[in-house]
Amino acid sequence: MDTAERAYEKFQNQMIAFDNLKIEMNELAVDLDQQLSDKQSLILQQEQDHKQKVNDLTNQEYKLKLQAKSLKEKENATRDKLNLAMRSLEQQKSKVEDLVKKKQSLVDTKQDLESQIKQLETAIDQGTRELNKSNDNMSLQMNKNLVELNKYEIYTGLKIEVQSNELMCFKFFNLDPNDYDREFAITLNIGGSTYSIENTSPKLSDETVEQIQGKLNQGRQLSKFLKEVRTLFKDFVQY
């Protein structure tokens, strides 16, 4: 083989090698493009995933902030309710303490009243016994007084009748020689601060009544007043 043939063969071999290299380069370029494309897709996907994750985290953060705000408001509301409940509890406690004090005061008052009632019952019982004893003594004394009164009336010619708590009637007899049983009466009101003559029988003059009534209220001597009235009735019989 001559030189030209060897050169041509070498050229052909080089062309074949170039073509093979070109094919490899093309394949490498395609593979590189695919890798770049895949890499870009992966980067884009990661970027989207990252954005989505950031967005999700942002949303979660917003929701958590809302929840935190809501919890804070609930916490404040709960604290306010607790403070109000505590104040109410303190007020109720104070009221309960006041009621306990009032109850104790009532118990003490009740005990004092019961003690006073017992003392009063004892005093009433003692007073009742003394009153019964006094009534018995009074009844006995009244019986004696009736006897003495009858003697007194016969001796003095005067009967005393109590008509009410305010009126007393004094009746004189043994004044009229023609009729010793004839009665002469004067009714005296003793209910006020001063005595007043309500009526006389037989009737004395108004001037005479005013005169003896004035003397009675001035001197306050009933016995002297009765003596003067007896004298007036006796003079009345003589005239």
Curated annotation (Swiss-Prot):
The lineage of its organism: Eukaryota, Fungi, Dikarya, Ascomycota, Saccharomycotina. Component of the NDC80 complex, which consists of NDC80, NUF2, SPC24 and SPC25. The gene is SPC25. The keyword Ubl conjugation does not apply. Acts as a component of the essential kinetochore-associated NDC80 complex, which is required for chromosome segregation and spindle checkpoint activity. InterPro entries: Spc25 (IPR045143), Spc25_C (IPR013255). The keyword DNA repair does not apply. Pfam families: Spindle_Spc25. This is Probable kinetochore protein SPC25. It comes from the Eukaryota. One of its GO terms (biological process) is chromosome segregation. Belongs to the SPC25 family. It comes from Candida albicans (strain SC5314 / ATCC MYA-2876). One of its GO terms (cellular component) is Ndc80 complex. It is found in: Nucleus; Chromosome, Centromere, Kinetochore. Residues 19-139 form a coiled coil. PANTHER family: KINETOCHORE PROTEIN SPC25, KINETOCHORE PROTEIN SPC25-RELATED. Its main location: nucleus. Keywords: Cell cycle, Cell division, Centromere, Chromosome, Coiled coil, Kinetochore, Mitosis, Nucleus.
